[in-house]
């Protein structure tokens, strides 16, 4: 999962040999530089450690560091699931979490659950009620059906962002690639 998320952040990266430091677009608020979505302006300590490894030629170690960072950074999404029985949903939640943060991921999740009558408050806080509803819905429906709603709410989230005119095409493309990857896990 983590490797796929890194590839969605930088499509030119396929593993340690192609791992690189890239300049962020001027409109990006994450800083000036990134390594597969790990930005100098958001996670400076992690970025600097990974960059130092790349500069020292320790590409394998840098790649492993990126993978571990993704897993650690998105662990909350995994905990919401309650088990590893639904890897496709876990993947979409982790990918969105890495790209848009915990609160925004919680909101798309709550909106997707509400499609099926959950009646949740959409506040982005994935508390006991949201977790139970997620587990109940996944236990009582086809995961592919749930993913359609989650994907719909993810795309709606991106379309609502102020920076959609600048980054929207890329966000929707990433979302579609992530959805296709998730479907392959079912």
Regions flagged by a language model, labelled:
Residues 1-186:
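Cell-wall polysaccharide-cleaving catalytic domain and substrate-binding groove, primarily
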């Amino acid at each position: 999962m983590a490797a796929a998320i890194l590839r969605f952040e930088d499509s030119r990266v396929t593993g340690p040999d192609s791992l690189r430091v890239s300049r962020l677009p001027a409109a990006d608020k994450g800083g000036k530089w990134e390594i597969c979505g790990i930005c100098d302006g958001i996670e400076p300590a992690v970025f600097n450690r990974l960059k130092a490894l790349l500069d020292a030629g320790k590409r394998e170690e840098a790649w492993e560091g990126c993978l571990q960072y993704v897993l650690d950074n998105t662990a909350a999404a995994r905990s919401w699931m309650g088990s590893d029985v639904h890897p496709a949903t876990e993947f979409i939640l982790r990918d969105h979490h890495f790209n848009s943060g915990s609160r925004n991921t919680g909101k798309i999740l709550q909106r997707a659950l509400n499609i099926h009558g959950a009646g949740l408050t959409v506040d982005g806080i994935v508390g006991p009620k949201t977790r139970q509803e997620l587990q109940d819905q996944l236990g009582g429906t086809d995961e592919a059906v749930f993913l359609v709603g989650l994907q719909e709410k993810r795309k709606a989230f991106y379309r609502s962002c102020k920076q959609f005119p600048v980054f929207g095409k890329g966000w929707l493309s990433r979302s579609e690639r992530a959805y296709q990857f998730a479907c392959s896990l079912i």
